[in-house]
Regions:
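Generic structural signal for individual residues within well-ordered alpha-helical segments
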Residues: 44, 90-93, 163, 184, ...
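GST-like fold's C-terminal all-alpha helical module
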Residues: 99-194, 202, 248-253
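Long, charge-rich low-complexity segments
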Residues: 208-241
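GST-like domain detector, emphasizing the conserved glutathione-binding G-site
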Residues: 1-133, 228-253
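Acidic/polar loop patches that form or flank catalytic/metal-binding clefts of enzymes
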Residues: 81, 197-199
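Generic structural signal for helix capping and beta-alpha/helix-loop junctions
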Residues: 39, 207-208
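Juxtamembrane helix-loop transition sites at the ends of transmembrane segments
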Residues: 29, 115, 182, 196, ...
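Exported/periplasmic ABC-transporter solute-binding proteins
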Residues: 202-203, 227
Length: 253
């Protein structure tokens, strides 16, 4: 079988959870930046939505991080990413969906406010306050969900942990780290794993992307859940400013 190729972007939480899974399973792969640069066109050709991460194995193309993890677990089942118990498996999948939608949208939009200057100041302030309150709520709920367990799937490292980790690392980098001791201890345990140490990113990559956006050489994607969150947060004027500047996209076109 040909070497797997992962089209990704280092700061994408969706790509990060896939990379952790690949490394925990000891599956070799090549990485390509699929968001900007020469490989972005390949992603648009291979994926109807032009989204990363995208996993390519010979003629097999797998898109969407959740589906990629399903594929990896079916093709390389050891070690498994989900518990054996059906109820725990359902809980793990629900947590992954929560991370991929609500929590991702919160941190994505907070990052946009912190490192761009789109829209009027009052709208930006409203979104920042809404986002900080949402993040605090999510962190408290995650701490309750973790409890005294070592991992979110109990005694085993699984896809729930891989889904939560990128967001909690991002909150720490953005100086909005969780206050709960059990969640912080879990974060330290996870970051000590070799599979995680290799995917941690600094803000430099995000700042470089924002510089490309300002220069007009890159456009950010407003996925549906991010757009819904921004409008609920009172950011309609910010969206209008971005559309006027033509620095976002809603689809491949």
């Amino acid at each position: 079988m040909r070497m797997l190729v992962l089209y990704e972007f280092g700061l994408s939480p969706f790509a990060q959870k896939v990379k952790i899974a690949l490394r925990e399973k000891n599956i070799p792969f090549d990485r390509r930046n699929g968001l900007t640069g020469e490989h972005a066109a390949e992603v648009r050709r291979l994926s109807r939505r032009g989204e990363i991460p995208l996993l390519l194995g010979g003629t097999t193309v797998v898109t969407d991080s959740t589906i990629i993890l399903d594929y990896l677990d079916e093709k390389w089942p050891d070690p498994p990413l989900l518990p054996d118990d059906p109820a725990r498996r359902a809980e793990s999948r629900s947590l992954e969906e929560w991370c991929d939608s609500e929590i991702e949208a919160t941190l994505y939009n907070l990052g946009e406010i912190m490192f761009s200057e789109d829209g009027p100041a009052e709208a930006r302030q409203a979104v920042m306050e809404f986002g900080q309150a949402e993040l605090t709520r999510h962190q408290a709920a995650l701490a309750d969900r973790l409890g005294d367990d070592d991992f979110f799937d109990g005694s085993m490292l699984g896809r729930a942990d891989m889904s939560v980790l990128p967001h909690m690392n991002a909150s720490r980098v953005m100086r909005m780290a969780p206050a709960q001791e059990n969640l912080l201890a879990w974060l330290d345990r996870m970051n000590a794993r070799p599979s995680v140490a290799e995917v941690k990113q600094s803000l430099d990559e995000f700042k470089a992307l924002m510089a490309e956006v300002r220069a007009g050489s890159a456009r950010r994607q407003m996925r549906d859940h991010r757009l819904d969150w921004l409008l609920r947060a009172g950011g309609a004027a910010i969206l209008e400013a971005r559309m006027g500047a033509d620095n976002i996209r809603f689809s491949v076109a």
